[in-house]
A protein has these predicted regions:
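Transmembrane beta-barrel domains of Gram-negative outer membranes and organellar outer membranes
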Residues: 2-8, 17-67, 84, 89, ...
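Hydrophobic alpha-helical membrane-anchor/signal-helix detector
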Residues: 3-31, 64-109, 120-138, 160-168
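Short acidic alpha-helical/loop segments enriched in Asp/Glu that coordinate divalent cations
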Residues: 33-36, 93, 143-145
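Outer-membrane beta-barrel translocator/channel fold
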Residues: 113-114, 118-119, 143
Length: 214
């Protein structure tokens, strides 16, 4: 069942991450982002946003690393933000599309550049395809107690790379610990017990039995 409450939390985290990303991009050299910082500073912020929105979308000349590596990865992270919370592939794609289009391309980024044709297509489409592959891979990692090649450190790191939003929030909520407990219960591992009460000549007798399965 889709977890709408957690999806809103994820969206809030994405908003904070978007602000942080803009700060980092602003600090990069102009040739890394193709933003004309000197000219942008001459135009009021919201006037600049409206100007860019009216002119777009256009085919951009951004660094291919941004367009064809980082944007698909960002799209996969958006997709996983919904998919890992019980949403279908279609619902997760819609969420990815909305975040990449309205939150980013016509949102934060439009304050600095005209919306991009490549980003409007590559981020949600390629990102969702990549995201579904991430989802399948992460499910295998989680089912294996967050281990890869026997290493929980490696498994946890890979899970975070595949699903950074949910894993970051989950680190504060203790989600991994709870998942490991659920895995042990499904396998019949851990401590289990039972109690009993029976009549006797002196009244009632009772007892408790404990079993630990390895």
């Amino acid at each position: 069942m889709p977890n709408w409450k957690r999806l809103w939390v994820n969206t809030g985290v994405l908003t904070g991450a978007g602000v942080l990303t803009m700060v980092v991009l602003k600090a990069l050299p102009a040739d890394a982002t193709a933003w004309n910082k000197r000219e942008d500073a001459k135009v009021p912020m919201f006037k600049r946003w409206w100007r860019n929105v009216r002119k777009g979308p256009v085919w951009d000349g951004d660094n291919p690393i941004f367009n064809y590596v980082l944007h698909p990865y960002a799209g996969a992270a958006y997709y996983m933000g919904a998919r890992s919370q019980g949403f279908s592939t279609w619902g997760s794609f819609v969420y990815c599309f909305c975040i990449s289009t309205f939150f980013w391309e016509y949102g934060f980024e439009a304050f600095n550049e005209i919306p991009s044709v490549q980003d409007l297509i590559v981020t949600p489409v390629v990102g969702s395809l990549l995201g579904e592959a991430f989802y399948v891979a992460k499910r295998h990692i989680v089912a294996n107690d967050y281990r890869i090649l026997g290493s929980r450190v490696l498994g946890t790191a890979c899970a975070w790379l595949l699903d950074p939003i949910n894993e970051t929030i989950g680190a504060f909520r203790g989600d991994q610990k709870h998942q490991l407990q659920r895995n042990r219960m499904r396998r019949g591992e851990g401590l289990s017990g039972s109690s009993w009460i029976a009549p006797s000549t002196n009244g009632l007798q009772g007892g408790v039995s404990l079993v630990y399965n390895f």
